[in-house]
């Protein structure tokens, strides 16, 4: 499996646009991103590498961030990149941004959090209860071994999020600027699902993260899952292009490490 995979190739007139790397959701796949309209740039999708082999990350989200940062450096050697993801993918994007923080050749120009709930969930299960099983649909011709590995991947990603310690930025640094896209509706179930615990809060609770890095919240019709259905995809694609335009033009001053002088200097983002 190619990873990352080029989901959209930039049209000729957008060849110089900042590339976007979108990270997998809690299911480990990047399939939803294939349904988006053109985002006018190269769009790469990063899948969970153990989706089919049953492997795990020893260091959870932090381990994913380090590996995925390496993936990005393999595709873009220098310049600007944009990061983002739907649901769990947004949290992973923040960790990857932290892992790229001291890479002098690369600048994370911004992050898109696509309906990513703040990972501060209540303790809603007894401590000794077994891990939650997040069931996935049956794929035609899928072997029992493959399905078991895929189910294991889902559970591992969700567990990694539940114990993740969000990265901290020090010495005047902060996360790259982010645009949050929030679905307006709740998932139509009898009980409130986890993704809707902060549904009415700005940026689904991310104001609790003490860096004031979200520069804009955009809103789309639909719920957490339906935004990728045909009825809502045109609006979602439009909002994503709007978010990307905002980040493309956002001047951001940060502290980067000068590789030649081996000292910290304040410069404008490349």
Curated annotation (Swiss-Prot):
Induction: Expression of the botcinic acid clusters genes BOA1-13 and BOA17 is coregulated by BCG1 during both in vitro and in planta growth. InterPro entries: AB_hydrolase_fold (IPR029058), Thioesterase (IPR001031). Its EC number is 3.1.-.-. Pathway: Polyketide biosynthesis. GO terms for molecular function: hydrolase activity. Probable thioesterase; part of the gene cluster B that mediates the biosynthesis of botcinic acid and its botcinin derivatives, acetate-derived polyketides that contribute to virulence when combined with the sesquiterpene botrydial. Botcinic acid and its derivatives have been shown to induce chlorosis and necrosis during host plant infection, but also have antifungal activities. Two polyketide synthases, BOA6 and BOA9, are involved in the biosynthesis of botcinins. Belongs to the AMT4 thioesterase family. This is Probable thioesterase BOA10. It comes from Botryotinia fuckeliana (strain B05.10) (Noble rot fungus).
């Amino acid at each position: 499996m190619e990873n990352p995979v080029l989901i959209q190739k930039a049209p000729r007139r957008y060849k110089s646009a900042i590339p976007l790397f979108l990270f997998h959701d809690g299911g480990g796949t990047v399939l939803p991103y294939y349904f988006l309209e053109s985002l006018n740039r190269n769009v790469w999708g990063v899948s969970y590498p153990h989706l089919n082999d049953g492997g795990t990350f020893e260091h959870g989200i932090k381990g994913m961030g380090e590996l995925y940062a390496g993936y990005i450096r393999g595709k873009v050697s220098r310049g600007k990149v944009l990061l983002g993801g739907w649901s769990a993918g947004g949290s992973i994007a923040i960790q990857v941004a932290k892992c790229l923080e001291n890479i002098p050749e690369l600048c994370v120009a911004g992050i898109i959090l696509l309906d990513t709930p703040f990972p501060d969930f209540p303790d809603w299960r007894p401590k000794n209860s077994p891990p939650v099983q997040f069931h996935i649909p049956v794929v035609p011709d899928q072997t029992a071994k493959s399905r078991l590995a895929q189910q294991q991947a889902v559970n591992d990603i969700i567990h990694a999020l539940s114990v993740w310690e969000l990265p901290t930025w020090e010495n005047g640094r902060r996360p790259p600027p982010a645009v949050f896209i929030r679905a307006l509706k709740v998932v139509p179930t009898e009980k409130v699902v986890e993704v809707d615990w902060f549904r009415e809060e700005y940026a689904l609770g991310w104001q609790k993260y003490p860096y004031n890095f979200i520069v804009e919240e955009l809103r789309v019709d639909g719920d957490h899952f339906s935004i990728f259905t045909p009825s809502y995809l045109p609006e979602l694609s439009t909002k994503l292009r709007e978010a990307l335009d905002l980040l493309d033009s956002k001047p951001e001053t940060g502290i980067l490490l000068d590789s030649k002088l081996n000292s910290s200097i304040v410069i404008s983002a490349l």
